[in-house]
A protein has these predicted regions:
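Juxtamembrane transmembrane-helix boundary motif
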Residues: 1-8, 23-116, 128-138, 148, ...
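Hydrophobic, membrane-facing alpha-helical anchors
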Residues: 14-26
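Short arginine-rich
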Residues: 19, 152-153
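Conserved, well-structured core segments that form the ligand-binding/active-site neighborhood
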Residues: 119
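Hydrophobic/aromatic end-of-helix segments at the C-terminal termini of transmembrane alpha-helices
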Residues: 124-125
Length: 178
């Protein structure tokens, strides 16, 4: 059914990310570039945010989801080209708090946005880590590990919410995951 194409793509994307995220997390762990002390508290927020994000995405039209994804791509592209996060981090190391009280909150918005657009969260987690005073290596490694809970919770959310609607799902699909 045409009305669920984007939701199916996002849910399936998150399900496939889960497996590659495990491999990536292990690889970065072996290089000692994962800040595990942040992964766990970030994950709490990410799991909650990803499930809520999947539920919110399920209420949006294909057209609105396409616009959200397009805007995300433009903003991330501008950030990557401009290097704004790295420039700010050089100017003011740790200009975003990564205290034990703030980290789950950061995780929740990362999980929420990531599950809406179908990504593992690295585009948000890496800049957050850099803004929090960590180096790029730690940011990428920690983001890789955080992709596991985002992908798992997001995919489960899409499976659940896809079963609560009256649409013709493709044969073999579990909710919005194919």
């Amino acid at each position: 059914e045409a009305s669920i194409i984007v939701l199916m793509a996002i849910g399936t994307s998150l399900a496939s990310i889960f497996f590659s995220a495990i491999s990536s997390a292990l690889s970065h762990h072996n290089k000692r570039s994962v800040e595990w002390s942040l992964v766990m508290p970030l994950s709490v927020g990410m799991i909650v945010g990803a499930v809520i994000g999947a539920g919110y995405a399920a209420t949006l039209s294909n057209e609105n989801l396409k616009w959200i994804i397009t805007i995300f791509l433009i903003v991330i592209g501008i950030e990557m080209i401009s290097g704004l996060t790295q420039a700010l981090a050089k100017k003011d190391k740790g200009f975003i708090s990564l205290s034990k009280f703030m980290v789950p909150g950061h995780g929740s918005w990362i999980g929420f946005l990531s599950s809406i657009i179908g990504i593992g969260g690295g585009s948000f987690t890496t800049p957050l880590m850099i803004a929090g005073g960590y180096n790029i290596r730690q940011g990428i490694g920690t983001a890789a590990a955080c992709g596991v809970p985002i992908a798992a919770a997001g995919a489960i959310g899409y499976m659940y919410y896809g079963q609560t609607v009256e649409v013709n799902l493709p044969s073999g699909a579990v909710g919005y995951v194919f």
